[in-house]
């Protein structure tokens, strides 16, 4: 289908490289370079240059990488999700109305980064340890959620606006 494929690294030089070559479409799998909105950087460049691309737009990616903002939006639209709080420091471990067990995650990472067996906490001491690990290792807040037991599924949506289709559910299994 496409005879001329160019690989462009998602770094500081990407903008100029996109400007140099006329692209029919960009297959965006970029994670971005730096910062909490890193996954939105390439789509924002492509929007500015009016180059079509696959995947979510810059705004969607920026919001989704912030787990707390995503959960607030889900809650606003009455989509059920686990109770949570955001911890910036160990002292925040006492400011919650959640039940154990809980799961502690970096607030602005994806693909399971920063989540280990120790992320599932059953006591205030374990909670403090995990908040400290995430705030020190990742230099960002920790998202603390009540752990929801059960099966884990992910859904993909293909298309935009009124032409979107939900693809079949995929179960995420760790066994």
Model-derived features: positions:
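Conserved N-proximal alpha/beta basic substrate-recognition cap immediately N-terminal to
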Residues: 3-85
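Alpha-helix N-cap recognition
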Residues: 10, 89, 122-123
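Alpha-helix C-cap/termination motif
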Residues: 20-21, 96, 136-137
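Generic preference for hydrophobic
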Residues: 26, 53, 84, 104, ...
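Rossmann-like NAD(P)H-binding beta-loop-alpha module
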Residues: 76-110
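Glycine-rich phosphate-binding loop of ATP-grasp-fold ATP-dependent ligases
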Residues: 102-130, 152-154
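Phosphate-binding site of ATP-dependent enzymes
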Residues: 124-175
